[in-house]
């Protein structure tokens, strides 16, 4: 009888030990499972947060690559599709490095070229507006350099002459930017600021300050800096023709046709020389 009692007690204790062991094993599995799930969630959350943000140095280096690509595309600007790709590259550079002055003023320059060569009215208007915005950004970034002021003023001038959007620019806006360029660098772009000021006087109605004689005066100031500037000679010839100085106009036009063009400005030279020949033929016909 006592043996049966001892046997039952042993069985109970054995059951308790087995139950406890099983319970501990279960707890251990639960803990391991919980830890595994926790690690999985942590890893997933790390992946969802995305890659670490690039450092400012990395952003600047990447923006510099975009600038290099943009310059290469601008060299093919005769193909407006390549020019548009260059504009995209400059926008990317500014997104990566918002304080990049070179990207800002070049974006203004590229948009000006697109606006003055596109046959699509909406694209032209949009490009002038984008050029003005980029020029303003450049001026805000480095007000003491001429590039931003010049291309802002150029886009103001183009918008005033061509754009169907009213209120983008006034004669005073153009004049103020070009006068700022002259204070900072009188010979900038081979006297181009004098040329733009002259065009303001040449093309503006008299009621807002247009005056062909003043146009001649302004453009002549650019001649000491503008010997290789085909467009300066062309527009000065136009001003001479308007005030009846045909011999002086012929002289400027022949300078264009006889000059050796800068390889970096072949598209501009081709345009200027074609217009020069047309004006020369017109003057010769009387």
Give the role of each language-model region.
Residues 100, 145, 188-190, 229:
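Residue-level recognition of tetratricopeptide repeat
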Residues 47-49:
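Bacterial signal peptide processing site
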Residues 6-35:
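Bacterial N-terminal signal peptides that target proteins for export
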Residues 227-233:
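Alpha-solenoid helical repeat architecture
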